[in-house]
Amino acid sequence: AHSMTKKQENITVECVRQVRDAVGPDINLMVDAHGRFDLPQARRLAQRFEEFDLLFFEEPLPPENLDAYVELKRSTKTPIATGERYVARFQFRELLEKYCCDYIQPDAIYTGGMNELRKIAMMAETYYCPVVPHNCNGPVCTAASIHAAACMPNFLMLEYIPVPEREDVLVEPLVLKNGEFELPKKPGLGIELNKKVFKNYIFQPRDLDHFTPAREIFL
């Protein structure tokens, strides 16, 4: 866990203020911290964000210490979301039992598939906890997440990152209209892979700045 300088924190809050002013009060607004902050700074930010009526503050703390999440949640009116880095329903069980957050974010790939995602959602339903599936791994994961979400009574929304250059791995792209995906109706996941383009996506190691200390990458 890391912290920003006071100046960086003030800039962050001002950025959120300007976005809220631009979109108005009726648009859902979320802030994602990628687990960067220590507890004191996460608490300060969550409390300062209260005036902006966020839908949630995503992963303000690293995922390992659930008691820290309990302390954070008790200290703020800003809803908290987390769970994208968990890989099993047993981790989500503890997360839910401790009431660490307001929304959980299981990923169909990281948790072992759409059936496991569905089981996690069923468990969350008993805690009246909405599910916001994490989804940053391309159109195949999106298709799996759509099917799982279709049978989740407590599904809220699906994370979706449009990356046009990755859509060509499908013969027919998924249909997105007015912010909603149409459920594919073909067998299986309802998609067909375009194997001709696989050579364009050979794995290449790379570094992501998602978990780099905030001081090193901020602005």
Report the location of each language-model feature:
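Shared catalytic-loop signature of beta/alpha-barrel
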Residues: 47, 53-56, 64-187
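Metal-dependent enolase-superfamily TIM-barrel catalytic cores that perform enediolate-based chemistry
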Residues: 1-76
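Catalytic cores of large soluble enzymes that bind and process phosphate-bearing ligands
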Residues: 4-11, 112, 137, 189
